[in-house]
């Protein structure tokens, strides 16, 4: 369908630009490299500022929608948080929650093929799904990000950590 990577990037970039402009959404467009363009947006939803990005990956002919959870994880709690993220990801047919241990950032990423261009209805539907996932996952993960576990969760974490420590110390 596309004669070159440059044509692919140009067409997909224009299609996303048209969609955002049609919805009167403010965005930043960054050309990260000759094969990657990223659109960044922010929305105020339910009292949270939700950041989103749409990333065009020419090499994979994909659009990656990324929703940034409005919470950061304290690295001290990464062990129980990552276990919960693994459980949540196992339930998902598409997309995944990701945790960046360098800065505590948590995202929900959804990649899909745009090899034949962007279908506006599909893009809109997926964009809203990612926004909803961010809000839903925020509610599920937030108490694990700062150690606000209930008694049962606390005991489970302590038990698992104790078993790990005992095994390592052998």
Where are these regions (language model features)?
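Long, well-ordered alpha-helical scaffolding segments within enzyme catalytic domains
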Residues: 122-142
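Short, internal acidic amphipathic alpha-helical interface segments
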Residues: 67-105, 109
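Long, continuous compositionally biased terminal/linker segments
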Residues: 42-74
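Well-ordered alpha/beta subsegment
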Residues: 94, 99-128, 146
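Charge-rich, low-complexity N-terminal segments
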Residues: 1-51
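Hydrophobic residues embedded in beta-strands of well-ordered beta-sheets
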Residues: 37-39, 61-63, 104-106
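Short, highly charged C-terminal tails/helix-capping segments
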Residues: 142-170
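Long, hydrophobic, amphipathic alpha-helical segments used as structural scaffolds
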Residues: 31, 96, 138-149
């Amino acid at each position: 369908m596309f004669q070159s990577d440059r044509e692919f990037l140009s067409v997909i970039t224009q299609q996303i630009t048209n969609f955002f402009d049609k919805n009167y959404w403010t965005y930043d467009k960054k050309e990260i490299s000759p094969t990657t363009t990223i659109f960044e947006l922010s929305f105020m939803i339910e009292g949270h500022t939700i950041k989103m990005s749409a990333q065009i990956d020419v090499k994979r002919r994909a659009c990656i929608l990324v929703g940034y959870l409005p919470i950061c994880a304290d690295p001290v709690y990464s062990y129980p948080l990552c276990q919960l993220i693994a459980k949540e990801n196992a339930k998902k047919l598409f997309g995944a929650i990701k945790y960046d241990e360098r800065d505590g950032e948590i995202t929900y990423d959804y990649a899909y093929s745009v090899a034949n261009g962007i279908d506006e209805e599909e893009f809109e539907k997926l964009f809203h799904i990612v926004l909803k996932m961010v809000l839903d996952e925020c509610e599920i993960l937030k108490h694990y990000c700062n150690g606000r576990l209930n008694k049962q969760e606390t005991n489970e974490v302590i038990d698992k950590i104790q078993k790990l420590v005992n095994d390592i110390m052998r």
